[in-house]
Amino acid sequence: MRVTDFSFELPESLIAHYPQPERSRCRLLSLDGPTGALTHGTFTDLLDKLNPGDLLVFNNTRVIPARLFGRKASGGKIEVLVERMLDDKRILAHIRASKAPKPGAELLLGDDESINATMTARHGALFEVEFNDARPVLEILNAIGHMPLPPYIDRPDEDADRELYQTVYSEKPGAVAAPTAGLHFDDPLLAALREKGIEMAFVTLHVGAGTFQPVRVETIEDHIMHSEYAEVPQEVVDAVLAAKARGNRIIAVGTTSVRSLESAAQAAKNDLIEPFFGDTQIFIYPGYQYKVIDALVTNFHLPESTLIMLVSAFAGYQHTMNAYKAAVEQNYRFFSYGDAMFITYNPQALNERVGK
């Protein structure tokens, strides 16, 4: 399969730079997987699309203020983007500089350059950085870090982004990008879903900066997926198996929930799904046999991204590309702060030929 098979024309004006004033009032494009039929509506329509006993699986990761500015003590400006927190003192990060720092280099971080750190080692494209500070890493990041808005949101971060670029149920700090499908859920909608008898479970996948890396190969089978840490605890496994046993559906909220659940299913030895705690490099593209999920809530993704490939594997390639074409024609808002889709599984996607 060629990466270019997953391209589509997107006017710059459809890229959302700010979220809707009310989270759950965004637009919702529903795609019926088996038929390809499209329905236009509002995100709160989700309430009518789910049945009592269905299980929504959310990702409860919390975005950290992962972008730091500063300079090398020897001179030269740097920009640091945290990939993950290693412990209370160390981070693994991308560093943008005119000349990459060498191990042992002293870094002065923060807008006022008040935080001292040392680049201790290099691991491929990533740098290990240790803070010379009594405070734990997370406290330092909260004090001096900027919210890591995606590169296509072409504006500086604002104070409001510290809450707007978080899901209302975010709990475990560690992501450098929000699981954006979850941004549309507000407390009234969650309460209404519970009232209807919709079950809820929470996985954790700390989204890494690799999620924004372009696919740099021509053939998607040659792509090497970035690694991210995921947790699927026993209570999620129990909820999934119970929902399946009673004939209800598993609805993943976002591609990160998909990747967490499917990673846990891939690693399972004796059951459909078992607890999973570890790094995952799962790459889902057409031809992948989904094991757990029956429906998906997701935003609109970048052309030629691994995420539009994941959606195509679920809904079918032609159905997905047709839906995206319709979304552009109907002026849906795209990407992290944009509108959403509700998609049901297309069993024919597994054997569909990909290509235009």
Swiss-Prot record:
Principal cellular location given in the protein's record: cytoplasm
GO molecular function, one term: S-adenosylmethionine:tRNA ribosyltransferase-isomerase activity
Enzyme Commission code: 2.4.99.17
Keyword DNA-binding (UniProt): no
Alphabetical keyword list: Cytoplasm, Queuosine biosynthesis, S-adenosyl-L-methionine, Transferase
Reactions it catalyzes: 7-aminomethyl-7-carbaguanosine(34) in tRNA + S-adenosyl-L-methionine = epoxyqueuosine(34) in tRNA + adenine + L-methionine + 2 H(+)
Known pathway: tRNA modification; tRNA-queuosine biosynthesis
Keyword Transferase on entry: yes
Any one annotated GO CC term: cytoplasm
Localization of this protein: Cytoplasm
GO BP term (any one): queuosine biosynthetic process
Domain of life of the source: Bacteria
Job of this protein: Transfers and isomerizes the ribose moiety from AdoMet to the 7-aminomethyl group of 7-deazaguanine (preQ1-tRNA) to give epoxyqueuosine (oQ-tRNA).
Family per similarity comment: Belongs to the QueA family.
Subunit and interaction comment: Monomer.
This protein's name: S-adenosylmethionine:tRNA ribosyltransferase-isomerase
Organism listed in the record: Citrobacter koseri (strain ATCC BAA-895 / CDC 4225-83 / SGSC4696)
